[in-house]
Amino acid sequence: MFTLSDFDFNLPPELIAQTALPDRTASRLLEVDGTVAPARLVDRHFTELPSCISAGDLLVFNDTKVLKARFFGQKASGGKIEVLIERVTGTHTALAQIRASKSPGAGTTLRLADAFDVTVGERVDPFFTLNFPEPCLDLIEQYGRLPLPPYIEHDPDATDETRYQTVYASNPGAVAAPTAGLHFDQPMLDRLDAMGVERATLTLHVGAGTFQPVRVDNIAEHKMHSEWYDLPQSLVDKIAATRARGGNVIAVGTTSMRALEAAARAADEAGRPLAATQAETDIFITPGYRFRVVDRLVTNFHLPKSTLLMLVSAFAGVETIRAAYRHAIEQRYRFFSYGDAMLLTRRDTPEAPLA
C-alpha cells in the first residue's frame, strides 16, 4: 500500500524551469533503466535521443494544441473574474472554471477581455457552461491568454506562444501542453524518420486537472480528472506492426501513455484486441498497474505528490524513480514543463497487486 508521502521529495525552487531554453533540443536527457539492479542512470543531452532508440521502434506523439484558454473580465456588477476554459464542447459552448467573489448564476452575462460577452449556462461541477456569441475557438485564439502552469511566474509572452506548443500540434483543445513533446524540433523528427523510426499520433486534450493536487493520504481514494482522447486506427495498425517486428512502443509524454493504456485496458476488459477509440478516460496509473502497450516513455520531471509522479513510478519502479530524481537534483537538472527530459524503460513486473 503506497501513501501520498511515498511520492514526496524536496525540490530546490531554483530548479523549476521558468523559461524555455533557446533551442528545443538543448535540454538534457536522463536515461533510466530500472530493469537492472541498481538502476542504470545515464546523463545525456536530448540530441542523443536517436542513439537510444532503434529502427523499427514506434514513437507515439500527442498532437493536441494548447488553447489560449485564460481570460480576465468582469460581471455586469463590475466584479472582477478570471475564467479558464477547460473544454470546448460545441461550436459556441465551452466548460470553464470561474474565479469570482461570488459564483455567477445561470443567465449571468460576463464580459471577457473587454471584447465580447458570454452567458453562463448550467453548472457541471466543478465547471460552468459558457455560451459564446461567435465560434468559441475563434474568440479564444483572438482574445485569450496562454494558460501557463501555476509554477511559472511570468506572464505569457510571444516566446511562450511558440515554445509552449509542440511543433506538431494540430488539434486545438488542451489547456496544458503535452510537455515531453516540447523537446522535439523538425530536424530531430526528420532524423528519426531517416533512421527508420516509425511515428504516429493520437489526441488527448490535456485538462487543467493535470495540475490538480492529490489531497488524500490513501492514493486509492483520489478521484482522477477526466479527459477526452482519440486513438485512430492508423495508430492501432502501427502498434501491431511494431509488435510483429519486435520493436518498442515509445510514448512521448504521460498523456500519450494514458491514452494508449486507457484504450488497451478497455479492450482487455471487453475481451477484444486494441481498436480505434474515442472516449473519456479518468485512468489513474499507480504502482501495481499492468502496462499493456507502452515499453518506453519520454517524459519530463514531475511535481512532488502528483499523479504523474505516481505514473512514472508505476512504469519504472518506485525506487528507480526515487534514485533518478535524487540524481537529477544533485546534477541540477531543470524540472517541470520547461525543464529537462527522461527516457524510462518499463519495469518487467508490477510492484503491487495488479490494477
Curated annotation (Swiss-Prot):
Disulfide bonds: none annotated. GO terms for molecular function: S-adenosylmethionine:tRNA ribosyltransferase-isomerase activity. GO terms for biological process: queuosine biosynthetic process; tRNA wobble guanine modification. GO terms for cellular component: cytoplasm. It catalyses: 7-aminomethyl-7-carbaguanosine(34) in tRNA + S-adenosyl-L-methionine = epoxyqueuosine(34) in tRNA + adenine + L-methionine + 2 H(+). It is found in: Cytoplasm. It holds the Pfam family Queuosine_synth. Its EC number is 2.4.99.17. Keywords: Cytoplasm, Queuosine biosynthesis, S-adenosyl-L-methionine, Transferase. Pathway: tRNA modification; tRNA-queuosine biosynthesis. InterPro entries: QueA, QueA_dom1, QueA_dom2, QueA_sf. Its main location: cytoplasm. Signal peptide: none annotated. Belongs to the QueA family. HAMAP family: QueA. Transfers and isomerizes the ribose moiety from AdoMet to the 7-aminomethyl group of 7-deazaguanine (preQ1-tRNA) to give epoxyqueuosine (oQ-tRNA). Monomer. This is S-adenosylmethionine:tRNA ribosyltransferase-isomerase.
